């Protein structure tokens, strides 16, 4: 109910363009049922509830169809922690996870995604009028360049010398550093020498 009608139209447009089967599931009763029990629910928290409700449906449908659920988060969102924990970034396979937002745009253009979809302002569409760049206080076109240089170990002075401001650099570094927990497995209290993910490690799951 909170989503823009345009998002629904674009979903059907993309499905039609690529010949993809589409099934629409209304999560409004799920979300509003919880909201009715939680009178202090803020728009931000409700947005997280909606994202997690989508995942309930996605994983149930994947089991029903014996299919693999795919994630949609891109590298910029993941580095910024700009996603709902146990929401959009939950699926076991994420084809876009190592592509910055600007790279996703170029890939979309290359694949023939309709221009009105590629050019629309990025938004989670969980709160009316919300946009990614307003939330982040930074344009993706600038954020991605800073992120790439920061991850490769370039100095602050070098990055600032590319024409970015100290405030832009601070925002990027702060978001990356304070959201590391969202990109990691749950923290486990180590009580044995066989703790999973710490001492018990598999080099690679592989099928001959």
Question: What function would you assign to each model-found segment?
Answer:
Residues 1-79, 159:
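ATP-dependent adenylation/nucleotidyltransferase module used to activate substrates
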Residues 21, 114, 165-166:
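Short coil/loop linkers at secondary-structure junctions
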Residues 32-33, 79-80, 125-126, 167, ...:
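Short secondary-structure boundary/hinge segments and terminal tails
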Residues 131-208:
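Peripheral terminal appendages
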Residues 6-10, 29, 44, 53-56, ...:
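Conserved active-site and cofactor/substrate-binding residues in soluble primary-metabolism enzymes
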Residues 8, 35-37, 82-83, 128-132, ...:
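Short secondary-structure transition/capping segments
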């Amino acid at each position: 109910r909170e989503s823009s009608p345009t998002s629904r139209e674009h979903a059907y447009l993309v499905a039609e363009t690529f010949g993809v089967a589409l099934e629409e599931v209304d999560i409004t009763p799920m979300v509003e049922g919880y909201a009715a029990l939680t009178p202090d629910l803020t728009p931000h928290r409700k947005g997280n509830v909606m994202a997690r409700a989508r995942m309930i449906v996605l994983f149930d449908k994947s089991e029903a169809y014996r299919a693999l659920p795919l994630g949609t988060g891109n590298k910029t969102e993941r580095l910024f922690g700009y996603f709902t924990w146990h929401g959009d970034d939950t699926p076991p396979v994420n084809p876009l996870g190592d592509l910055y937002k600007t790279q996703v745009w170029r890939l979309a253009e290359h694949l023939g995604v309709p221009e009105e979809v590629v050019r629309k302002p990025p938004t989670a569409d969980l709160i009316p009028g919300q946009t990614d760049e307003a939330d982040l206080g930074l344009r993706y076109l600038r954020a991605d360049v800073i992120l790439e240089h920061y991850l490769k170990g370039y100095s602050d002075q070098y990055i600032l010398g590319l024409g970015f401001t100290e405030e832009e650099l601070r925002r990027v570094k702060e978001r990356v550093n304070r959201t590391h927990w969202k990109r990691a497995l749950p923290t486990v209290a180590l009580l044995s020498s066989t703790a999973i993910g710490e001492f018990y490690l598999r080099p690679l799951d592989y099928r001959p």
